[in-house]
Amino acid sequence: MKKIAFILALWAGLLGAFEPKKSNIYFGAMVGLAPIKITPKPVSDSSYTAFLWGAKGGYQFAFFKALALRGEFSYLMAIKPTALHTINTSLLSLNIDVLSDFYTYKKYSFGVYGGLGIGYFYQSNHLGMKNSSFMGYNGLFNVGLGSTIDRYHRIELGAKIPFSKTRNSFKNLYFLESVFIHAAYSYMF
């Protein structure tokens, strides 16, 4: 009985999943948090969480109603204000993601996404270290949950996770570890 109920639920969820869906250009904004850590610890406060904001845009090509591929260009900036200066971390990235909106109800669809990207990281850091900039290219994993509302509005909760640590530009002994956790809104044209 459980197998039959599962098969019926799966069939109902996939009903209409292979109908064509509109492809879109989209633009959006992101906010979130970025836990950042410098290793090995140069000073006692080398781990912190920074507020992040950003913008993104791209093209979403829909194969079917429940499956799409998107190319995206995004910029994220994480800011940590301190007493006398601000620590600024930036990520400029180009991403390719697969989206699967597997559950649809009336004007709403819900699903997951995952993909890969390449990004350029830069951080200007003044935590008691001289020559403390981190910069370099790194690969990214993109994962998250998303929902499309009324075909034009998309909200997402996701993360951009670098493949490896970013090396210090001047002192090769220090590395920057970070994850960019964000909530995003996009308008699809």
What are these regions (language model features)?
Residues 1-22:
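Cleavable N-terminal export/targeting peptides
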Residues 19-31:
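Short N-terminal segments immediately surrounding and downstream of signal-peptide cleavage
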Residues 25, 33-35, 49-126, 184-187:
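Gram-negative (and chloroplast) outer-membrane scaffold detector with strong preference
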Residues 28-29, 33-44:
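N-terminal targeting signals for Sec/Tat export/insertion, comprising classic cleavable signal peptides
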Residues 40-43, 74-84, 88-91, 132-189:
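Predominantly the C-terminal beta-signal and adjacent terminal strand-loop region
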Residues 125-133:
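C-terminal beta-barrel architecture of Gram-negative outer-membrane proteins
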